[in-house]
Regions:
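Generic hydrophobic, helix-prone segments enriched in Leu/Val/Ile
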Residues: 5, 62, 93, 178-183
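Short, surface-exposed linear patches
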Residues: 40-43, 80-81, 161, 169-170
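Conserved NTP/Mg2+-binding pocket subregion across the NTase superfamily
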Residues: 48-125, 222
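Short linear interaction motif-like sites in intrinsically disordered regions of transcription factors
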Residues: 37, 73, 80, 160-163, ...
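Short linear motifs in intrinsically disordered/low-complexity regions
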Residues: 4, 10-13, 86, 104, ...
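Conserved nucleotidyltransferase catalytic core and NTase-mimicking acidic/glycine-rich helix/loop elements
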Residues: 96-223
């Protein structure tokens, strides 16, 4: 089915390029029923390539710009290359929409510290469930910060291990520790994670976000 669409797209002057995204785009986590998720970049929308319904073997949609895609969808396009790019513009736009400004890492860093702080405070007064939920909520904020601080978009959870293995960050990410935090809200693990995160934050120019947590920094550092 993809071959048929590509043959049409190559002959169609309205088409600029075609991108296969998701699991097919990476060749990862595929199974017998895996569908093809396709975006066709066109000069003008006509609906010619839009799938009539969801759930088929191939689901295609037309856009005039990849920048029009919803933000939640963008991790599906990281580490993919166009299967058709008549002008080179599609590859350039792919690189642009999956790039993250490291300056934006301050917000998820602050969110991470807030969740860790709440977890530690709740644990101290015996609110076990609240402490666990806050610990779990801290993890996506931590990952958002870590990837954004290095100019990258956090992957979907299903691709996290693959991405760290195939495209590692320049800092270690202890996934076993993250799993322990999510399952047990262990404060020793949370403290170790905060100390590491503070070091990364200061090294990459986000020390002001950490300093804004005074006078609670001593508590956050386990003192």
């Amino acid at each position: 089915m993809l071959d048929t669409l590509l043959a049409e797209a190559r002959e169609d002057e309205n088409v600029i390029g075609v991108v296969v995204h998701g699991s097919r785009g990476r060749g990862l986590h595929l199974h017998e029923g895996s569908d093809w998720d396709v975006v066709v970049v066109v000069r003008k929308r006509t609906g010619r390539y839009d799938s009539a319904e969801r759930g088929g073997e191939l689901e295609a949609s037309e856009v005039t710009s990849l920048a029009d895609l919803p933000r939640w969808m963008l991790p599906a396009f990281t580490w993919t290359t166009p299967v058709l790019d008549k002008t080179g513009a599609v590859a350039a736009e792919l690189a642009e929409i999956t790039r993250v400004d490291p300056a934006t890492a301050a917000e998820p860093l602050d969110d991470y510290v807030n969740s860790y702080y709440r977890s530690a405070k709740n644990a101290r007064v015996g609110l076990g469930l609240a402490a666990l939920l806050d610990a779990q909520e801290s993890i996506p904020h931590y990952l958002d910060f870590l990837f954004a601080a290095h100019g990258r978009m956090r992957p979907y959870n299903k691709w996290l291990e693959w991405e760290l293995r195939e495209h590692p960050l320049p800092v270690d990410v202890d996934l076993d520790r993250l799993e322990r935090i999510a399952l047990t809200r262990n404060l020793d693990d949370q403290l170790a994670l905060f100390r590491e995160t503070e070091g990364v934050a200061r090294k990459l120019g986000h020390g002001a976000t950490i300093d804004a947590w005074e006078p609670d920094l001593a508590f956050l550092r386990g003192h």
